[in-house]
Amino acid sequence: MINIRKTHPLMKIINNSFIDLPAPSNISSWWNFGSLLGICLILQILTGLFLAMHYTSDTMTAFSSVTHICRDVNYGWLIRYLHANGASMFFICLFLHVGRGMYYGSYMFMETWNIGVLLLFAVMATAFMGYVLPWGQMSFWGATVITNLLSAIPYIGTDLVEWIWGGFSVDKATLTRFFAFHFILPFIVAALAGVHLLFLHETGSNNPSGLTSDSDKIPFHPYYTIKDILGALVLILALSTLVLFSPDLLGDPDNYIPANPLNTPPHIKPEWYFLFAYAILRSIPNKLGGVLALVLSILVLALMPVLHTSKQRSMMFRPISQCLFWLLVADLLTLTWIGGQPVEHPFIIIGQLASILYFSLILVLMPLASLLENNLLKW
């Protein structure tokens, strides 16, 4: 009998992606984050869909509609907090996924990596626009500050900002279009994730050693399906704990104050997952320079394959590069902390030093360390 799993046009795609896929036998739990990101995306789309059924994208009623969801809709509070904290879990998984790619040299799969960078930008744009929707103080002022950065673009800047706003300030038109974009972008992200997987399956997965694993492959199912289910359970446990015990832990209390264009909050700051980029933006006194640094802080990831000077793919056997990688992690944590602090001494200088170190590590120190390691191994 012919197996329908292997012959049916649709089943065949699923089979070749999740069942009979040959996978390296030694991939660690760091390879779980791809599937976890898929789960996060599905969760966000589902909770977002149910929120959109009750939300109104009008400046007069947006804040009230979110309150209505939390108070009057059956389990509305749960859906709302799953969506808000689901975004945080999404970014935790994203950062770990990208970090894994940097550590083990997964960026050598050029197409997969570049689509991944594009995905990162798309998810960041989605999260930013989603943060504007509750129309609290931080929503309004965050939208004002971040969209205003585009005015730094020479010649067309001011026109561009007013075009995005749909007027001369962040108002009803802005909120409505942000809701429309926030609704459509996750589906674009899902499509890009499909392309991301398509390119990954052209080459097969990397593995911790960075060596080719063609001689030692195992089927994805049952080995990695069960491993992914364990990862999913840990993710769901962490998210449930966050949502049910401290749902506002990662949020800003200012967002419980309805948006008021006449009253600026003392400290305007984005959600925690943007703080590292926000710190880099603020560390440069020039507006255009800051915007360029902000974009480059993510875009620099696209240069990783070009900056790879080592003769080994993975950092598994490269202790100097390992030290610099963990220094980069510590630096990003420092930038995240600085991004949430007021613009005053000593935070300004710490932020500037951390920003310089961030770019120096990726663009200069890590490639040099790789060359040094090549020489030490007499390669």
From Swiss-Prot:
The chain crosses the membrane at residues 33-53, 77-98, 113-133, 178-198, 226-246, 288-308, 320-340, 347-367. The cytochrome bc1 complex contains 11 subunits: 3 respiratory subunits (MT-CYB, CYC1 and UQCRFS1), 2 core proteins (UQCRC1 and UQCRC2) and 6 low-molecular weight proteins (UQCRH/QCR6, UQCRB/QCR7, UQCRQ/QCR8, UQCR10/QCR9, UQCR11/QCR10 and a cleavage product of UQCRFS1). This cytochrome bc1 complex then forms a dimer. Its cofactor is heme b. Binds 2 heme b groups non-covalently. One of its GO terms (cellular component) is mitochondrial inner membrane. Heme b b562 binds at H83, H182. It is found in: Mitochondrion inner membrane. The gene is MT-CYB. PANTHER family: CYTOCHROME B (PTHR19271:SF16). Heme b b566 binds at H97, H196. InterPro entries: Cyt_b/b6_C (IPR005798), Cyt_b/b6_C_sf (IPR036150), Cyt_b/b6_N (IPR005797), Cytb/b6-like_sf (IPR027387), Cytochrome_b (IPR030689), Cytochrome_b_C_euk/bac (IPR048260), Cytochrome_b_N_euk/bac (IPR048259), Di-haem_cyt_TM (IPR016174). This is Cytochrome b. Belongs to the cytochrome b family.
